[in-house]
Regions:
Chain B
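Alpha-helical transmembrane segments within multi-pass membrane transporters and channels
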Residues: 92-142, 284-285
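Helix-loop-helix "hairpin" substructures at the membrane interface of multi-pass membrane proteins
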Residues: 104-112, 118-123, 175-249
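Membrane-interfacial amphipathic/re-entrant helices at transmembrane-helix boundaries
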Residues: 1-57, 92-107, 335-338
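Cytosolic-side transmembrane-helix boundaries in multi-pass membrane proteins
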Residues: 1-27, 215, 219-222, 292-339
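Single transmembrane alpha-helix segments in multi-pass membrane proteins
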Residues: 26-31, 39-94, 125-132, 266-276, ...
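Transmembrane alpha-helical segments in multi-pass inner-membrane proteins
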Residues: 235, 246-311
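Inter-helical junctions in multi-pass inner-membrane proteins, predominant
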Residues: 35-45, 92, 150, 156, ...
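Transmembrane helix-bundle core of multi-pass membrane transporters
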Residues: 130, 134-196, 223-226, 245-254, ...
């Protein structure tokens, strides 16, 4: 072990990190050799982001030892880490959209050179060298915002290389890429490895990058649960280690024949987001909508609930037109929406759990003069919290004290108490633990059994397959494919998504 | 079980801290100058003085609950007072008998409240429909309201009211000053509105997270319009009290009250980022400020020094609050994800 550690570029031993009582990482050992590609796998909340933050110096560890580039680093901050050659490429790439390609690539290098004057020619030269290293041609003077996603990623890689990166950490590198773009990325990774640059892929979908990786490390609930050569892992074994259970979830039972149409969407379009969206949703049906990042799935979800005003097209519920671009009209038509980002869009974090549910039912419980019938309102909210098995010792406690899975159930309870006809769930299990995820899926199945139409929008393919009767695949704002949930495997669906 | 926001025992609440502060300031001032501060005359004069800016602080409170602010309160108060004063001088006049003058007073009060509501509608529209930051929208509209008042009066004071007008600001009912009764009723009303009604809960929730309110299908535009209309009407009530006490109306009365109203709301524990605020806290803050102000008066501290003290106090209180409940604030400003 120590022998390996001698030459390792990154050598972490017994890393433990606690946040206010929550153990995010628990005694994790982790090494990366120069020129090695490592897959760091784990579900949301498994601690992989925390591990990356520790390596890049953003978070301080509670216990453990860090060696980077053969030196002990008792004190680590982002500057020291970057100077040692650790570069992180976040999912959003953190580029300056209004600057040109070469300015973005050379920016950090020029800053760290501590020259007072900006040298344009030098900057272009740095950028060209970096692009040559990965064998890619991109116009140096184009503004970054006008580039496609895959090119933005390449610019980010070049920026890291220009700063003498010895280790590039890539967060969810393939979520926005088509299959062809993924193959090009893999080619570039191979070149980098030959150059002695190490790579860490952080993702919950790693099948694509397994082939260029030497090693796989799987985290679950802050502990390292598996480590080994990449050749010993496949999609199934990764899923097993990440979730801790063999889990073909029960697929949904068939929609009853002759179910009537609940929702009808005709020719919905919004310039720059989505176009020609047509579908029907039957009572008791679960419709999955998926697509890569930027495929328009979230804009569509928001448009269905009136948060985005479409340019044209119509939405009907129960045969009646719903005014578009107005969430209140959508809500009164019986549409509910559980947003993607619980923390900023879904919850009133500082407010009590019971209030977070009751906000959906104020009209029902306000009597004469707008005065609330508080006890009835609280009783109803508490009833829903109980039905959805929210584990809360005290429903007057702020909702931020709950875990991700319970928080998601609070948002669900708010909508279910309104007895919606159609419930739209955008990323229903993002950031919730494995157990809660299965529970949320079973709630979705129960809802459809009660005759509610459910739309699940997600990029989590196993989730869609476990819940949906039908799946719409979106690309570049259009529905490109429609498949029956029980007729495809995950691989086929992934292929249709990214081909 | 209650619907009262954050759960905490009373002794740990910000309101309890304020109670201690109010008592401490009172005792301190009493010790400094027992015969003057504790005299019946001083206590009565305090009870007549504070309601006007206390009512402005109530207006500030409800807008701050949404994470906004209303810097036009003094402008609205003066514009309403000027309109009421013009009605009372042009149509009633000082010679009028009590009976008919009461009718004109009622009419003037109604007109003032309408002006307040209209001004609030303007502010609310700027914030809700045009999405302007409340601090800038109301800074601008406040200047417009003041400008209108100047245009109507030529900048000079309007005076010569029927004798009944003075009643609002200067008489006592069963030994309690009328302005104080007015403030008590408005504070109680606002308290009930914020804690017992659906509207109040929407205001609090909107303040806690406007985006989540939108996603929860709360009609946020209607909430904002109502909030600024209520603030405008409270401001015009304060304007009427000022008018009655001064027995005149002028476009630039009470200019020092703006900072004071903001200070009281913040001192009263209202979260300037929205989502938390209790009327009882504001009432206690009003008392503390009045004790302090009277005390400084008796110690013959100059008016300029007093403004300086208010400014320092405002910043000091906000710094203290940001440490005490800071985590809550920053968690909302930039949610930290732990994974």
């Amino acid at each position: 072990m120590s022998d390996v550690g001698e030459h390792a570029f990154i050598d972490l031993a017994g890393i433990t990190k606690r946040y206010a009582g929550v153990t995010a990482l628990d005694g994790v050992d982790f090494t990366v050799q120069p020129g090695e590609a490592v897959c760091l796998a784990g579900e949301n909340g498994s601690g992989k982001s925390t591990l990356i933050k520790i390596i890049s110096g953003v978070e301080k560890l509670t216990e453990g030892r860090i060696r980077i580039g053969g030196k002990d680093r008792p004190v680590l901050n982002p500057r020291i880490s970057a100077a040692a050659g650790v570069m992180v490429i976040f999912q959003d790439f953190s580029l300056f959209p209004n600057l040109s390609v070469y300015e973005n690539i050379a920016f950090a290098t020029q800053l760290s050179a501590h020259r007072r004057l900006y040298e344009r020619d030098k900057a272009r030269e740095i950028a060209r060298e970096a692009l040559d290293r990965i064998g890619v041609k991109i116009d140096l003077d184009v503004r970054v915002e006008s580039l496609p996603v895959a090119h933005k990623q390449l610019v980010a890689i070049c920026r890291a290389l220009a700063s003498q990166a010895k280790l590039i950490i890539m967060d969810e590198p393939t979520t926005a890429l088509t299959e062809k773009e993924v193959r090009r990325l893999l080619g570039i990774i191979r070149r980098l490895k030959e150059d002695g640059v190490a790579v860490i892929f952080v993702s919950h979908k790693l099948a694509e990058v397994l082939e260029v990786s030497e090693k796989v490390v799987v985290l679950r609930n802050g502990k390292k649960v598996a480590e080994g050569p990449a050749s010993e892992f496949d999609t199934q074994s990764l899923a097993y280690h990440m979730t801790g259970r063999e889990m073909p979830e029960t697929p949904p039972s068939a929609v009853p024949a002759g179910a009537k149409t609940l929702m009808r969407v005709d020719n919905l379009a919004k310039q720059g987001s989505f176009a020609d969206i047509n579908f029907e949703l039957n009572a008791g049906e679960v419709l999955g909508i998926t697509g890569l990042l930027g495929s328009g799935r979230t804009s569509l979800a928001k448009a269905l609930f009136g948060l985005v005003a479409p340019d044209r097209g119509s939405i009907q519920v129960d045969g009646r037109d719903v005014a578009t671009g107005d969430p209140i009209a959508a809500c009164y038509a019986g549409i509910g929406y559980v947003p993607e980002d619980r923390l900023t869009e879904g919850l009133f974090l500082s407010q009590s759990i019971v209030r977070n549910v009751a906000i959906g039912r104020l009209d029902k419980h306000s009597g004469s003069g707008g005065f609330l019938k508080a006890s009835a309102m609280i009783e109803e909210a508490a009833g829903w919290l109980k039905r959805l098995k929210v584990k809360a010792p005290d429903i007057d406690a702020p909702v931020q004290s709950l875990s991700g899975g319970n928080q998601q159930r609070v948002v669900l309870a708010r909508w279910l108490s309104r007895a919606p006809r159609v419930l739209i769930l955008n990323g229903p299990s993002v950031g919730v633990d494995v157990g809660s995820k299965a529970d949320i899926h079973s709630i979705i199945r129960d809802l459809s059994a009660e005759g509610i139409g459910v739309i699940v929008i997600s990029d989590d393919l196993p989730e869609l397959l476990a819940t949906s009767h039908r799946i719409l695949v979106m690309r570049d704002g259009r529905v490109t494919d429609e498949v029956a949930g029980n007729s495809v495997t995950e691989e086929e669906l992934a292929h249709r998504l990214a081909s | 079980m209650t619907v009262q926001g954050q759960k905490m025992s009373f002794t740990r609440s910000p309101e309890f801290r304020l109670l201690i502060i109010a008592c401490a300031v009172f005792v301190f001032m009493s010790l400094l100058s027992p015969d003057r501060f504790l005299s019946g005359q001083n206590l009565t004069s305090m009870a007549f003085q504070f309601p006007e800016f206390a009512i402005l602080a109530l207006a500030m409170t409800i807008t701050m609950m949404t994470g906004g602010i209303d810097l036009s309160v003094v402008g609205v108060a003066n514009l309403s007072a000027v309109v009421a004063a013009l009605i009372l001088t042009q149509l009633a006049g000082p010679e009028m008998a009590t009976g008919p003058s009461l009718i004109w007073l009622g009419f003037a009060v109604a007109a003032a409240l309408c002006i307040g509501a209209a001004a609030g509608l303007v502010n609310g529209s700027l914030v809700a429909f045009f999405g302007l930051p409340p601090i800038l929208a109301t800074l601008g509209s406040g200047l417009v309201f003041t400008g209108l008042a100047i245009a109507m009066t030529g900048g000079s004071a309007v005076m010569g009211f029927p004798a009944t007008v003075a009643w609002i600001g200067n008489e006592s009912l069963l030994g309690v000053p009328v302005p104080l009764i007015l403030f008590g009723l408005l504070a109680l009303g606002l308290h009930l509105l914020l804690t017992k009604t659906a509207f109040g809960l929407r205001v609090t929730m909107y303040g806690a997270n406007p985006l989540a309110a939108l996603y929860a299908a709360v009609n946020i535009n209607r909430v904002l319009l109502k909030v600024y209309v209520i603030a405008g009407m409270l401001a015009s009530s304060a304007g009427l009290v000022i008018m009655s006490r001064a027995n005149s109306a002028k476009a630039d009365y009470g200019s020092s009250y703006l900072l004071l109203a903001v200070l009281i709301a913040v001192l009263g524990g209202v979260n300037p980022y929205g989502g938390y605020g209790r009327v009882i806290g504001v009432v206690l803050a009003v008392l503390s400020m009045q004790f302090l102000s009277s005390g400084l008066n008796m110690l013959q501290v100059s008016n300029f020094a007093r403004e300086l003290i208010w400014g320092v106090l405002l910043i000091f209180v906000m710094v203290i609050n940001s440490n005490a409940i800071g985590r809550g604030f920053f968690a909302r400003a930039k949610p930290t994800k732990s994974s």
